[in-house]
Amino acid sequence: MDLAQIKFDLAKGGLLIDVRTPEEYSEGHVKDALLIPHTQIFTADIPAKKDASIYLYCKMGPRAEFAASVLKERGYTKVTNLGGLDDMEALGFEFV
Protein backbone atom coordinates (compact mmCIF):
# COMPACT_ATOMS: atom_id res chain seq x y z
CA MET A 1 0.00 0.00 0.00
CA ASP A 2 1.30 3.45 -0.77
CA LEU A 3 0.16 6.92 0.22
CA ALA A 4 -0.87 7.91 -3.31
CA GLN A 5 -3.23 4.93 -3.63
CA ILE A 6 -4.71 5.54 -0.20
CA LYS A 7 -5.31 9.24 -0.94
CA PHE A 8 -6.91 8.28 -4.26
CA ASP A 9 -9.26 5.87 -2.47
CA LEU A 10 -10.11 8.45 0.19
CA ALA A 11 -10.95 11.02 -2.49
CA LYS A 12 -13.38 8.52 -4.01
CA GLY A 13 -15.41 8.16 -0.81
CA GLY A 14 -13.14 6.03 1.32
CA LEU A 15 -12.48 6.55 5.00
CA LEU A 16 -9.43 6.76 7.22
CA ILE A 17 -10.42 5.74 10.75
CA ASP A 18 -8.39 6.12 13.93
CA VAL A 19 -9.63 3.42 16.31
CA ARG A 20 -7.74 4.64 19.38
CA THR A 21 -9.35 6.30 22.40
CA PRO A 22 -10.54 9.93 22.31
CA GLU A 23 -7.69 10.81 24.69
CA GLU A 24 -5.08 9.29 22.37
CA TYR A 25 -6.69 10.97 19.35
CA SER A 26 -6.59 14.39 21.05
CA GLU A 27 -2.85 13.99 21.66
CA GLY A 28 -2.26 13.78 17.90
CA HIS A 29 -3.67 11.95 14.91
CA VAL A 30 -3.40 11.65 11.16
CA LYS A 31 -4.87 14.68 9.40
CA ASP A 32 -8.49 14.11 8.32
CA ALA A 33 -8.78 10.81 10.20
CA LEU A 34 -12.20 10.05 11.65
CA LEU A 35 -12.24 8.91 15.28
CA ILE A 36 -14.22 5.74 15.95
CA PRO A 37 -12.80 3.94 18.99
CA HIS A 38 -12.44 0.19 18.51
CA THR A 39 -14.83 -0.37 21.42
CA GLN A 40 -17.59 1.37 19.43
CA ILE A 41 -16.94 -0.25 16.05
CA PHE A 42 -19.71 -2.84 16.53
CA THR A 43 -22.47 -0.22 16.51
CA ALA A 44 -20.88 2.91 15.04
CA ASP A 45 -22.51 4.60 12.07
CA ILE A 46 -19.86 4.21 9.37
CA PRO A 47 -20.30 7.05 6.85
CA ALA A 48 -19.26 4.99 3.84
CA LYS A 49 -20.77 2.50 1.42
CA LYS A 50 -20.17 -1.18 2.08
CA ASP A 51 -17.80 -1.36 -0.92
CA ALA A 52 -15.83 1.82 -0.10
CA SER A 53 -12.17 1.56 0.87
CA ILE A 54 -11.78 1.84 4.64
CA TYR A 55 -8.34 2.23 6.19
CA LEU A 56 -7.78 1.75 9.91
CA TYR A 57 -4.93 2.50 12.29
CA CYS A 58 -4.25 2.59 16.02
CA LYS A 59 -1.12 2.97 18.15
CA MET A 60 0.52 -0.38 17.36
CA GLY A 61 -1.86 -2.30 15.05
CA PRO A 62 -3.86 -4.84 17.11
CA ARG A 63 -6.88 -2.62 17.77
CA ALA A 64 -7.05 -1.75 14.09
CA GLU A 65 -6.91 -5.46 13.22
CA PHE A 66 -9.77 -6.14 15.63
CA ALA A 67 -11.82 -3.27 14.15
CA ALA A 68 -11.09 -4.51 10.61
CA SER A 69 -12.45 -7.95 11.44
CA VAL A 70 -15.60 -6.42 12.94
CA LEU A 71 -16.19 -4.22 9.89
CA LYS A 72 -15.75 -7.21 7.60
CA GLU A 73 -18.34 -9.09 9.66
CA ARG A 74 -20.63 -6.08 9.23
CA GLY A 75 -20.35 -6.43 5.45
CA TYR A 76 -17.67 -3.91 4.52
CA THR A 77 -15.59 -5.50 1.79
CA LYS A 78 -12.52 -3.25 1.35
CA VAL A 79 -11.11 -2.89 4.85
CA THR A 80 -7.36 -2.49 5.41
CA ASN A 81 -5.40 -2.34 8.65
CA LEU A 82 -2.58 0.14 8.08
CA GLY A 83 -1.01 -0.72 11.44
CA GLY A 84 0.21 1.71 14.05
CA LEU A 85 1.42 5.28 14.27
CA ASP A 86 4.96 4.36 13.18
CA ASP A 87 3.53 2.67 10.08
CA MET A 88 1.45 5.75 9.29
CA GLU A 89 4.50 7.97 9.63
CA ALA A 90 6.52 5.65 7.38
CA LEU A 91 3.79 5.85 4.73
CA GLY A 92 4.11 9.65 4.79
CA PHE A 93 0.85 10.69 6.44
CA GLU A 94 0.63 14.17 7.95
CA PHE A 95 -0.13 14.36 11.68
CA VAL A 96 -2.00 17.11 13.49
Report each predicted region and the residues it spans:
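Rhodanese-like catalytic fold shared by cysteine-dependent sulfurtransferases
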Residues: 2-15, 21-53, 62-96
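Short, surface-exposed ligand- or partner-binding patches at beta-edge/loop junctions that are enriched
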Residues: 57-58
